[in-house]
Amino acid sequence: MAGRGGSALLALCGALAACGWLLGAEAQEPGAPAAGMRRRRRLQQEDGISFEYHRYPELREALVSVWLQCTAISRIYTVGRSFEGRELLVIELSDNPGVHEPGEPEFKYIGNMHGNEAVGRELLIFLAQYLCNEYQKGNETIVNLIHSTRIHIMPSLNPDGFEKAASQPGELKDWFVGRSNAQGIDLNRNFPDLDRIVYVNEKEGGPNNHLLKNMKKIVDQNTKLAPETKAVIHWIMDIPFVLSANLHGGDLVANYPYDETRSGSAHEYSSSPDDAIFQSLARAYSSFNPAMSDPNRPPCHKNDDDSSFVDGTTNGGAWYSVPGGMQDFNYLSSNCFEITVELSCEKFPPEETLKTYWEDNKNSLISYLEQIHRGVKGFVRDLQGNPIANATISVEGIDHDVTSAKDGDYWRLLIPGNYKLTASAPGYLAVTKKVAVPYSPAAGVDFELESFSGRKEEEKEELMEWWKMMSETLNF
């Protein structure tokens, strides 16, 4: 990963082995627009945002341009390479880039998972530039977000597919060319199918979260997983993400878990334990998008079945079942809640429409980002003030737990209401607290756990029951 300051650019250049395009020479890929054409197209700008499609060299250049403009709050890094060797680039925006600050939640946007679904890729490039611009202007909303959130933006998870789709002549692109990665793998069907595991666990008992815990080696050895998939799995496991959105194209709707149906049927509402907050998160996006939230909008395509759409949102399984998707994988393998947003009826619309898509989605992108500051947050520590990592935070009535990060910090997204939260960890007495959760900001609830490692074995079970009763009764 690149460091801060001048060393960050040098590290990036070394990783990419392609500094020529930044220093004056062009890094030309086969089929990429000529340099003169790119320079002419860059005149179509507004506040530094170029409303155009960015091929791979241009994508790199756009991200570095943001970094050069906002070096104090940004960093560029890569999570790995595509099958054809292109970097899976991420730009991070934070008041302390490169560092997880205890208590500060981590957010990610991912675009272009299907290479021919191009609007999300461009919107995320535009978003990075917009956040930089507005931070420098002193926009209070953006300044507060960047000071309180670590934001990661990956414009393209499938750069190989995008290059294939973009290389087609003319503006009218084939509906499928470039969808898959260079191996022909649909990345949104390529993640470990954790839905099937959790559905069994619902019936027979078993874990309801972090279903791939300590299994990185198995992931690396799985030859069925694409390199792009493996890279994102490591990313999800390495950073304590709280909230995410995966940007697609082909329809206009915000889709929430579960994506895969329990019965195996093609269409069936498949609620997760966090159905209420997921519905709210999806509405936080759709409600700011005029076309998406329009109840009178006709279907994108003649034979589309959008009967499951409500206020521009849908449950994934109710729309159509998707096994092996990234959305549900986030929820079941980590603490990260993710939705999938379909941004456009056309997958690769004409370039002159990109500005309109930006105007339709800008407020939605910011609104969704703000949702990370909902629910409950805090720290789990022992009586000496030491952080307890991997403590379990459970919510009464919701069969999905989250865990604390290495600094003992945790975040639990919830809709407004009254809840009982319990923090527990091996070797410690569990503590339960009651909390009234507003819409925002997140309520702060810290836990101090007492170790019983020194107590006699015969005392431990009795003490655990007594402590649980007392903590629930006295709310301490």
Swiss-Prot record:
Positions annotated as propeptide: 26-42
Active-site residue list: E342 (proton donor/acceptor)
Swiss-Prot/TrEMBL catalytic activity: Release of C-terminal arginine or lysine residues from polypeptides
SUPFAM superfamilies registered for this protein in UniProt: Carboxypeptidase regulatory domain-like (SSF49464), Zn-dependent exopeptidases (SSF53187)
Cofactor descriptive note: Binds 1 zinc ion per subunit.
Cofactors required: Zn(2+)
Keywords: Carboxypeptidase, Cleavage on pair of basic residues, Cytoplasmic vesicle, Glycoprotein, Hydrolase, Membrane, Metal-binding, Metalloprotease, Protease, Secreted, Signal, Zinc, Zymogen
Example of a GO cellular component annotation carried by this entry: transport vesicle membrane
Residues modified by glycosylation: N139, N390
GO biological process: peptide metabolic process; protein processing
Signal peptide: 1-25
Topology relative to the membrane: Peripheral membrane protein
Record-annotated Peptidase M14 domain positions: 52-372
Keyword Aminoacyl-tRNA synthetase: no
Keyword rRNA processing included in the entry's annotation: no
Localisation per UniProt entry: Cytoplasmic vesicle, Secretory vesicle; Cytoplasmic vesicle, Secretory vesicle membrane; Secreted
Cited InterPro entries: CarboxyPept-like_regulatory, M14_CPE_CPD, Peptidase_M14, Peptidase_M14_domain
Quaternary structure and interacting proteins, as annotated: Interacts with secretogranin III/SCG3.
UniProt function note: Sorting receptor that directs prohormones to the regulated secretory pathway. Also acts as a prohormone processing enzyme in neuro/endocrine cells, removing dibasic residues from the C-terminal end of peptide hormone precursors after initial endoprotease cleavage.
Protein name, entry field: Carboxypeptidase E
Organism: Pan troglodytes
